[in-house]
Curated annotation (Swiss-Prot):
Keyword rRNA processing annotated: yes
Record: active site: 168
PANTHER family: RIBOSOMAL RNA METHYLTRANSFERASE, RRNA METHYLTRANSFERASE 2, MITOCHONDRIAL
Protein name as annotated: Ribosomal RNA large subunit methyltransferase E
GO terms, molecular function: rRNA (uridine-2'-O-)-methyltransferase activity
Presence of the UniProt keyword Transport in the record: no
E.C. number: 2.1.1.166
Binding site residues for S-adenosyl-L-methionine: 67, 69, 87, 103, 128
SUPFAM superfamilies (UniProt xref): S-adenosyl-L-methionine-dependent methyltransferases
The species this protein was found in: Psychrobacter sp. (strain PRwf-1)
Enzyme class: transferase
């Protein structure tokens, strides 16, 4: 049975967040259109601008839970495509999606992903990974940069020339150094801030083509 969310017992700041969340255009749209989270519209806009994900492609979705990016990517690649998703959190099953639950920072999980990819040519790697934020930038930012570095390492291993990485990044310390590294490893890197990203959010998305 679903549990109804109420304002009872919430702090003032939590009540404000809840009101903003429930009033959010993209939250309402996601509920109406059957997406698991508003984040779906970030990937939809990114793909609208880049046309990266197409029918029949093989896509890997890192940090996939609750599954909205996998929903979008799955519809874009269609029945002929292949979608492999992974997250430290559980994710309800999606048709034609192979899900690997585990911590991407652990070598065993990385190896399971590589094994699932096998000899396939991966066309696009998606990374919406982010750490559990503490509210302290000095702690959160290095954790985010580390996850990005892991995503880049994975992408470099599985993407052929012409393949692409779409990766969430937090603006802040270490970001420019990471971008310089990316520019030396990929032929093209562009930044997209989707309309569905909240204006105050530090997140941007880099689209890197090998």
């Amino acid at each position: 049975m679903a549990t109804r969310i109420t304002n009872k017992g919430l702090s003032k700041s939590s009540k404000a967040w809840m009101k903003e969340h429930l009033d959010d255009h993209y939250v309402q749209l996601a509920q109406k259109e059957g997406y698991r989270a508003r984040a779906a519209y970030k990937l939809l806009e990114i793909n609208e601008k880049t046309n990266l994900i197409k029918k029949g492609m093989t896509v890997v979705d890192l940090g996939s839970a609750p599954g909205s990016w996998s929903q979008v990517a799955g519809r874009l690649v269609g029945d002929e495509g292949i979608l492999i998703a992974s997250d430290i959190l559980p994710m309800d099953a999606l048709e034609n999606v192979t899900f690997i639950q585990g911590d991407f920072r652990e070598e065993a999980v990385f190896d399971r992903l590589m094994s699932e990819v096998g000899d396939r040519q991966v066309d696009v790697v998606l990374s919406d990974m982010a750490p559990n934020t503490s509210g302290h930038t000095a702690v959160d930012q290095p954790r985010m940069i580390y996850l990005c570095e892991l995503a880049v390492d994975f992408a470099l291993r599985v993407l052929p020339k012409g393949g692409s990485l779409v990766m969430k990044v937090f603006q802040g310390e270490g970001e420019q150094q990471l971008r310089q590294q990316l520019q030396s490893q990929f032929s093209k890197v562009r930044t997209i801030k989707p309309a569905a990203s909240r204006p105050r959010s530090k997140e941007v998305f880099w689209v890197a083509t090998k």
